[in-house]
A protein has these predicted regions:
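Helix-biased "structured C-terminal domain" signature
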Residues: 1-586
């Protein structure tokens, strides 16, 4: 078998692919290559997923088909090892009360009456960073996955790189502020760590360049000529009508970052891709492959025009959009003729061990502490790297303003609504409670509660505003029900099934009629039946009477048996739990 070695990797691509695929089979995961893209020469991307659980998927990119597949499989192990596939979901009562929720080496810190953040969690530096004004409480730090107040706060062990000490960081903080940033898997610990640290630089410097509207120096043609594959990819994009700028994003040779920008003159928009690696050529190639990961040439019309409004560009919401799908705003200043920094033909490359030391030295020079959690329980090395003040995707204030576990205390109540027989005032009191707690009307209930509902039921599209319409109906407040029904039709109509949209049109009509005291409802019944159909008229009438107000929502038990999608997710998690238990028992 031929062996292909590429810079930055400590094993041949063929060996990595064979090893990763075999390990996945051994763990019980049946992975399929769902789609491939090769829009220009030397740019490949692939989407792989678990046949039994479509929520477990990754994308890979590379200059060759093999490199893209190895990339996707590596990312799959990264997300399995760090539990990232399950980061947005409640794992149910059984796992929440099992021997361990995340890893056997986790540590639980019980909640106390004063709700102070428990001793033994975080170090002094982290406490000062996450909670400078003493606003954090222990209750805010219960993790979404367990939602188990009785067990307390779950801390995961990280190694502080400056002195090798173990520091316990709440899973809640890891999940809320860092999401997928700084996670990596690889053939060796150094290879994976270099990748994870490079990603931290990439995102941090990208945010700085965008937020500060920095104008970057172009990479000279003679430097680009060292990388003929990249030159050919760019030439093809330009031939298709997309001007390309390749920039040195190192800010004067300090950071191993490259930026490539694509213009789309057909609609006046642009898109900036960033990549980082100690090896200049690897960083450049990554940036170009990232530009087109999961995109064909006809998918390049979804970005935004450049702007002169630098304040809007610097807003945190814009930077979050760039993290999610790179479709945020960019300042025209990035493209100024006179760059803010000179071009540097930088190189931080060496063996992966040397590269790790080089990158760590940059963090040390900036007085940034690095915390690393190592994971080897799946037979492939993976890690999660946290650099407070550099790798955070969301600000620390989100822990009290937008915590992913802020709806956990409502979970049992909301899930029990479809079969409930409460007093009318209790339904209306729940609307008041949601208002008092400041829940956003646009929030999807499944995301608030951490549910994988599948797309075939009303829970999938249910937002807080629509839930308020249902509660108002159940509480007999028809005026409020009409307000929230019309809100629902305005904001959710585009994602409703035809049946659900028709039901809401019918419900709105019946609610409007209920306000007309001098009209006789039966006079209109035949017309309604012909307009909306018997099923919708009966369902809307039952909602109006308070007899069945929760249209399309099935009752759900505490282990979420009602949602096959959630059950497939839990089955995947059980495979991981078995592997963890076996590894830590050694």
């Amino acid at each position: 078998m031929t062996q292909t070695f590429i810079p930055g990797k400590d094993a041949a691509l063929e060996d990595s692919i064979a090893r990763f695929q075999q390990k996945l089979l051994d763990l019980g995961f049946d992975i399929e290559e769902a789609s491939w893209l090769n829009p220009v020469p030397h740019v490949w991307s692939v989407h792989i997923r678990d046949k039994a659980c479509a929520l477990c998927f990754t994308n890979g990119k590379g200059a060759t088909k093999k490199a893209a597949l190895a990339s996707a499989l590596g990312e799959y192990f990264e997300r399995l090892s760090t539990n990232y596939f399950f980061a947005d979901f409640w794992l149910g009562d059984t796992i929440a009360n099992g021997p361990f929720v995340h890893y056997p080496n986790e540590k639980w810190f019980p909640l106390t009456e004063d709700d102070e953040v428990p001793e033994g969690l975080l170090d002094a530096r982290l406490r000062a960073f996450y909670d400078p004004d003493d606003q954090l409480t222990a209750g805010m730090l219960v993790d979404l996955q367990s939602g188990n107040d009785e067990r307390g706060v779950c801390g995961l062990p990280f190694t502080r790189q400056s002195d090798g000490e173990t520091v316990y960081i709440p899973m809640n903080i890891v999940g809320n502020l860092y999401v997928s940033n700084g996670m990596s898997a690889g053939n060796t610990p150094n290879e994976a760590r270099v990748q994870g640290l490079s990603e931290v630089f990439e995102r941090h410097i990208k945010n700085r360049i965008i937020a500060e509207s920095i104008s970057l120096p172009e990479i000279p043609a003679e430097v680009m000529a060292r990388y003929p594959g990249v030159v050919e990819s760019i030439a093809k994009l330009e031939a298709e009508g997309f001007p390309i700028f390749a920039y040195d994003g190192s800010l004067g040779g300090k950071y191993p970052v490259i930026c490539v920008v694509l213009f789309n003159p057909a609609n006046g928009t642009c898109f900036a891709s960033f990549g980082a690696h100690p090896d200049f050529g690897v960083a450049l190639e990554r940036t170009v492959t990232e530009l087109l990961q999961g995109r064909s040439l006809k998918d390049l019309d979804v970005f935004t025009p450049p702007t002169f409004d630098d304040e809007e560009v610097a807003e945190h919401a814009n930077l979050e959009t760039h993290f999610i799908d790179s479709s945020g705003l960019i300042s025209w200043d990035m493209f100024k003729q006179d760059a803010d920094y000179p071009f540097v033909d930088w190189s931080f490359s060496g063996t992966t061990e040397e590269e790790f030391a080089t990158l760590m030295a940059i963090f040390k020079a900036e007085d940034k502490e690095v915390y690393i959690a190592d994971y080897e329980h799946l037979g492939v090395y993976a890690c999660r790297i946290i650099v407070p003040g550099m790798s955070d995707i969301y600000p620390a204030e989100d822990l009290w303003l937008a915590n992913n576990s802020m709806g956990a205390h409502l979970r049992d109540t909301i899930l029990s609504l479809p079969g409930s027989e409460w007093e009318k005032e209790d339904y209306l009191a729940l609307i008041e409670q949601m208002d008092d707690e400041g829940l956003d009307d646009f929030t999807r209930v499944r995301e608030l509660l951490g549910l994988a509902t599948g797309k075939d039921n009303g829970w999938y599209t249910l937002r807080i505003g629509e839930l308020k319409a249902m509660l108002a109906l159940a509480g007999g407040d028809l005026e409020q029900a009409l307000i929230w029904t019309e809100w629902t039709m305005e904001f959710n109509a585009s994602i409703f099934s035809p049946e659900r949209a028709n039901y809401y049109r019918c419900l709105q009509t019946l609610l409007l009629l209920s306000q007309e005291e001098d009209r006789q409802p039966l006079q209109y019944l035949n017309a309604f039946l012909r307009m909306y159909g018997t099923d919708a008229v009966e369902a809307a009438s039952a909602a109006l009477s308070g007899e069945a107000s929760f249209y399309g929502l099935q009752a759900v038990d505490s282990d979420l048996q009602a949602f096959p999608a959630h059950q497939s997710l839990l089955k995947a998690y059980e495979k991981l739990q078995r592997a963890k238990a076996a590894f830590w028992a050694k």
